[in-house]
Amino acid sequence: MPISSALAERIATSPKAELHIHIEGSLEPELMFALAERNGVKLPYASVEEVRAAYAFDDLQSFLDLYYAGASVLLTEQDFYDMTAAYVARALADNVHHAEIFFDPQTHTARNVPMHVVIHGIVRALDDAEREHGFSSALILCFLRHLSEEDAFDTLEAALPYIQDPANRIIGVGLDSSERGNPPEKFARVFARCKELGLRLVAHAGEEGPAQYVIDALDILKVERIDHGVRAIDDAALVKRLAAERIALTVCPLSNEKLKVYPDLRDHSLKQLLDAGCAVTLHSDDPAYFGGYMNTNWLATFNALDLSAADAHALARNSFEASFLPEQDKALWLAKVDDHWKAAH
């Protein structure tokens, strides 16, 4: 049953933090085409409509193939700036006030785009967003799990000068790309090194991979937050642990539906995980490819799972609690979230 228009409006206007957003996954077809033209890159599509048609993929690998083709248009600092500024505009429209944004340097350095071009373009847009709109943000450098751990170490080494300068906003590392056949332990040493460096640790686990990958990400990689994690529902002991330790799951329902993790949103495990006391949060993942930014994800999920105002309040609170914001900033946002929701349930 669709939720009430009053609840839909309160969800849309609620303060939120976005903790699972790949900046390259926010590249809309129109901007992809504009950048291809600007840079003289030939795309395998004749029109924006053809790109949209290619978005009819139904598994992670087909999506990744398209994602990497799209990234080929990103060549200059201005390209990364434009892509990031476009994401921020959409986030602000959805009342996202803080974002912890993934970026994939290996996708770009493999194409001979220098690390500084990627980082400076993204950071310049985030600096402008903070100055002009008060938009708070941080960056999480992701290693591509289909590549080797040695490649991840090389990437970390190349990124270190940027990581060590707080102006670049890089607070942590993550692990993304093809989960099947690339278990967390493949990256145990590089994550141990990142922990030594004082970086925050997160990893994609339990999306297409099994619940065991969530356990391994926690126990081998020592991550603080699990990206996706929806397959945890298959292991009752793990669900209890996630709830007891308040380990956040950054869940992306439209992504899960599009990639057939859950072919029908009505079957999604989000509500079960939330009811079990897990620190579930709700995000957009790769919104240009999966059909929606934050509010679209929230509203689709609430309609499919018949969630309540109390659920919305919990999800909004969880998004700030699970963030890597300083405690005093978290407290300010949690008070704003509580004010927003106190009259609704």
UniProtKB/Swiss-Prot annotation:
Matching SUPFAM superfamilies: Metallo-dependent hydrolases (SSF51556)
Q: Which GO terms describe its biological process?
A: adenine catabolic process; hypoxanthine salvage; nucleotide metabolic process
Q: Coiled coil located at which positions?
A: none
The entry's substrate-binding residues are: 286
Q: Which GO terms describe its molecular function?
A: adenine deaminase activity; zinc ion binding
Listed Gene3D superfamilies: Metal-dependent hydrolases (3.20.20.140)
The record's remark on the cofactor is: Binds 1 zinc ion per subunit.
One Pfam match:
A_deaminase
Has keyword Methyltransferase? no
Cellular component aspect of the GO annotation: cytosol
Query: Which reactions appear under catalytic activity for this entry?
Result: adenine + H2O + H(+) = hypoxanthine + NH4(+)
Query: Catalytic residues?
Result: 207 (proton donor)
> What UniProt keywords are attached to this protein's entry?
Hydrolase, Metal-binding, Nucleotide metabolism, Zinc
| Annotated site residue numbers, Important for catalytic activity | 228
Its function?
A: Catalyzes the hydrolytic deamination of adenine to hypoxanthine. Plays an important role in the purine salvage pathway and in nitrogen catabolism.
PANTHER family in the cross-refs: ADENINE DEAMINASE
**Stated family:** Belongs to the metallo-dependent hydrolases superfamily. Adenosine and AMP deaminases family. Adenine deaminase type 2 subfamily.
Name of protein: Adenine deaminase
Its ancestry begins with: Bacteria, Pseudomonadati, Pseudomonadota, Betaproteobacteria, Burkholderiales
